[in-house]
Amino acid sequence: MQELKGIGASAGIAIAKAYRLEEPDLTVEKKNISDSEAEVSRFDEAIARSKEELEKIKEHALKELGQDKADIFSAHLLVLSDPELLNPVKEKISTDSVNAEFALKETSSMFVTMFESMDNEYMKERAADIRDVTKRVTGHLLGVEIPNPSMISEEVIIVAEDLTPSDTAQLNREFVKGFTTDIGGRTSHSAIMARSLEIPAVVGTKAATGTIQNGVTVIVDGINGDVIIDPSAETVKEYEEKHNAYLAQKAEWAKLVNEPTVSKDGHHVELAANIGTPDDVKGVLENGGEAVGLYRTEFLYMGRDQLPTEDEQFDAYKTVLERMEGKSVVVRTLDIGGDKELPYLQLPKEMNPFLGYRAIRLCLEEQEIFRTQLRALLRASTYGNLKIMFPMIATVNEFKEAKAILLEEKEKLVKAGQAVSDDIEVGMMVEIPSTAVIADQFAKEVDFFSIGTNDLIQYTMAADRMNERVSYLYQPYNPAILRLITLVIEAAHKEGKWVGMCGEMAGDEIAIPILLGLGLDEFSMSATSILPARTQISKLSKQEAESFKEKILSMSTTEEVVAFVKETFK
Amino acid sequence: MQELKGIGASAGIAIAKAYRLEEPDLTVEKKNISDSEAEVSRFDEAIARSKEELEKIKEHALKELGQDKADIFSAHLLVLSDPELLNPVKEKISTDSVNAEFALKETSSMFVTMFESMDNEYMKERAADIRDVTKRVTGHLLGVEIPNPSMISEEVIIVAEDLTPSDTAQLNREFVKGFTTDIGGRTSHSAIMARSLEIPAVVGTKAATGTIQNGVTVIVDGINGDVIIDPSAETVKEYEEKHNAYLAQKAEWAKLVNEPTVSKDGHHVELAANIGTPDDVKGVLENGGEAVGLYRTEFLYMGRDQLPTEDEQFDAYKTVLERMEGKSVVVRTLDIGGDKELPYLQLPKEMNPFLGYRAIRLCLEEQEIFRTQLRALLRASTYGNLKIMFPMIATVNEFKEAKAILLEEKEKLVKAGQAVSDDIEVGMMVEIPSTAVIADQFAKEVDFFSIGTNDLIQYTMAADRMNERVSYLYQPYNPAILRLITLVIEAAHKEGKWVGMCGEMAGDEIAIPILLGLGLDEFSMSATSILPARTQISKLSKQEAESFKEKILSMSTTEEVVAFVKETFK
């Protein structure tokens, strides 16, 4: 028996035989060719057959996984008809009189390196697409069979270095019980697909393909990120029980889909979801989300080479508001800069982007971008229950200035006969420490706060949460963070305003009892965390949690808080 | 009459005729030469004559400005005998058979670009030295007279693009009443020299040489950074009065050199100085400093290619402690990373260095560097009144761990028979917001706090203080900052501990009344700010300042606080 540690990318436990998805040997040698015309048509032939295959996979994905997953293969089909990729390959074949495999390899690796060097998640995913498409076309050129997971006809756990989008799209849930890969993380394609398919998955093990042989029994625990190879009968039994317990828990969660979130002693809080695109609303409703607590609008601006138009934005906001059917939607205005770059804005390189010219700072300076977004929101406001919040506010004057611009645009629209809702709540993110310290001053100006704990923790501890060397300082349970959260909640309630939280902490099982006791009104998290959180809260007493408030706030370290919460709220 | 705006680099007002320090025309053309041997000896000849001149300037600087200013010319003399510069020039003359001027120009500009590309203040100064030396040698090669400010024999104000170290070293205070340059800032050579010579100076005007003609009357106001060209009689009179008022004020300040710092109602606080090298102690004592509130030890590590030895550090700490003659010296342990890089440590490039692996984070990880510094400090402790503080502490555990390492090293030294003082106070910098928010927890562990407001403001407002685009958020008077400072002072005093401040805010005339009212015990600032601060405090009543505490802390913006303080403490 052997154990591997990886990243739990999709919850659940699977036990089955290992099926190694062998990377086909696609080693390409440079060969000189005489008839380049014949070689170019051989290349075209391979492109055509790849397109055929992708059309079939896209169909399968649409049926099994829904539109946005199928869209990935539309992107692949676009790559296959992109002259920017194909022409240089053909030119290379003719000018250098080299074989098509080599010309393709050279051209595509140039694109992959370029995209991967861009410090931007979206462009890295484009690199994965190009690598995936190149593999498929090269397979046809070399006459090498590309493994086709959809052909699997017995219960298996897939073992691979990484799963390309087309691999994961072909996974047939009936037989593929789970998978484990060497590389990848929670946000890579394979992980996102596993969660949609609800197939347990552990990624980033670094050693799956090196250790697991074909046919050997494997256990994949996607909750804790463990992979057990050739387990003893006893271990298999233990994990079967865990699997059943997980299924029971999932069933328990499912019962609460349409229930409100109420503590044991009758206190109601709102569980909302964080979303990035209109397509995410489906997941919110399926998981019993009572609202959207954070709509990150920057996705509308990313992965393109110019700003989205007012109408494009209007359509997106309108769709989300309509799909949420009157449930509240809190939209965060543009938060780019920091680690979210928009190449087409050509913002200057900064030594410390997280402490730089981003979000509301940029919007108050380059107002046309800001006003376009606000107009689109105001126009969409009549299609649902819209709330607007500004990110990265540091001073009271910044909030006042941003709100004044909103009201100015509203006035212009109303004058021009445009219908605009009259009860749009306007609030702000509390993610900069100064706003928590004098929350009483901000509470007079806002309709609500939403605490962005990811950044609030980062600035309060002066530690970049993306920097592994200082990640030990990213401490959500540090008493300093809990005291700042308390300041914000008390200040808001004193002015009759509500407080939500949209950082990862809001869905964290250790934080939830504390936050309930501190009086948080709304918890906004990733959709899949909502039902577990609702179940947890239903077993907690708000009064009991509140009774521990002073004790927790007077502790001096994270370790003390965690130990106390685990002990008290077992 | 015309006005220019620049940076007030050295206080005081000067009125005199303009003396343009013309940059000699040193344009160099590439010429092919036949006899390279003769050309090399022509080059050697020019080097020799430059050395002679520099020896004379060094002597003059030693007499007029003291050792550390003279050291600059030792550095220049070193450059003139540095084979790494000279050999490539001679090789270029022989291999490319080009004239010495061209060979020198090519080689030195390569070095200048390399040094200037290093994001490090010290290396940029090295670039200025090489440019200065190259100018001198090229002058000799071209037979062009380099202007020699020491030849000036009437009262003048020097007007130049920039003043090289050798220019400023030759300034004869008897005639040179002040100067103004196009480029440079508060920390450039010329500014530092002007302050030592106490010659009024305005740098960074961008337009001095472009606007001011030789012989025209010029007023230089080094306090406000203003330059007035061809002033009316009335303006001259106005500035003469300002000049006399400034001299009177300086005389008033001078009376308090050896006086304690006491408010109008008898409350004593300690005014200390921030220093970077042992040579700075002279300025501390000359300006009536009661202690060193911050000894930045990173200068010992910079501008070299390996770590300083334990003995090198011991010598530096011992010298400072001895020169301070029993007055307290608060030494900050190593604070590198962020904008202070040590190339020889090869630390990984970080996306946000100010939120990264720096200071105590690095020292707790790479303990040998930390332990070496602590041993040097402990050994020096018997030579004066040493206090030690750790920078960039974020959690209580970090402080406990750092203090445990100090006590471990102390135990080892004592066991080995080394004398170590028994009353070394151990404290910490409060510059990370978390430590201010739960200052009551830290106050149980430390002997004192020193509030590092430069970084505290930066993290609390999430705005990089070196980034011009967000500099408006660097707000020392923001009520959030003042409330954090209050938390720290109240927490410390409750535990019977003292609180100092070593950010720029401590010497700021708007902040001083507020800080006095909040109960700050020690104000540590640049030496030249001490006497003005002592004078200001002597006219303030602590009780009166304290009575405004609640009012100020309940304000919502910086602007409100500044207006109130200006109005109340006129």
Curated annotation (Swiss-Prot), chains A, B:
GO terms for biological process: N-acetylglucosamine transport; phosphoenolpyruvate-dependent sugar phosphotransferase system. The keyword RNA-binding does not apply. The N-terminal domain contains the HPr binding site, the central domain the pyrophosphate/phosphate carrier histidine, and the C-terminal domain the pyruvate binding site. General (non sugar-specific) component of the phosphoenolpyruvate-dependent sugar phosphotransferase system (sugar PTS). This major carbohydrate active-transport system catalyzes the phosphorylation of incoming sugar substrates concomitantly with their translocation across the cell membrane. Enzyme I transfers the phosphoryl group from phosphoenolpyruvate (PEP) to the phosphoryl carrier protein (HPr). Its EC number is 2.7.3.9. InterPro entries: PEP-util_enz_mobile_dom (IPR008279), PEP-utilizing_PTS_enzyme (IPR050499), PEP_util_AS (IPR018274), PEP_util_C (IPR000121), PEP_util_CS (IPR023151), Phosphohistidine_dom_sf (IPR036637), PTS_EI (IPR024692), PTS_EI-like (IPR006318). GO terms for molecular function: kinase activity; metal ion binding; phosphoenolpyruvate-protein phosphotransferase activity. Homodimer. Interacts with FloT. The reaction takes place in three steps, mediated by a phosphocarrier histidine residue located on the surface of the central domain. The two first partial reactions are catalyzed at an active site located on the N-terminal domain, and the third partial reaction is catalyzed at an active site located on the C-terminal domain. For catalytic turnover, the central domain swivels from the concave surface of the N-terminal domain to that of the C-terminal domain. Mg(2+) binds at E431, D455. Its cofactor is Mg(2+). It is an enzyme of class 2 (transferase). GO terms for cellular component: cytoplasm; membrane raft. It comes from Bacillus subtilis (strain 168). It catalyses: L-histidyl-[protein] + phosphoenolpyruvate = N(pros)-phospho-L-histidyl-[protein] + pyruvate. The keyword Transferase applies. Keywords: Cytoplasm, Kinase, Magnesium, Membrane, Metal-binding, Phosphotransferase system, Sugar transport, Transferase, Transport. Pfam families: PEP-utilisers_N, PEP-utilizers, PEP-utilizers_C. It comes from the Bacteria. The active site is at H189, C502. Belongs to the PEP-utilizing enzyme family. Its main location: cytoplasm. This is Phosphoenolpyruvate-protein phosphotransferase.
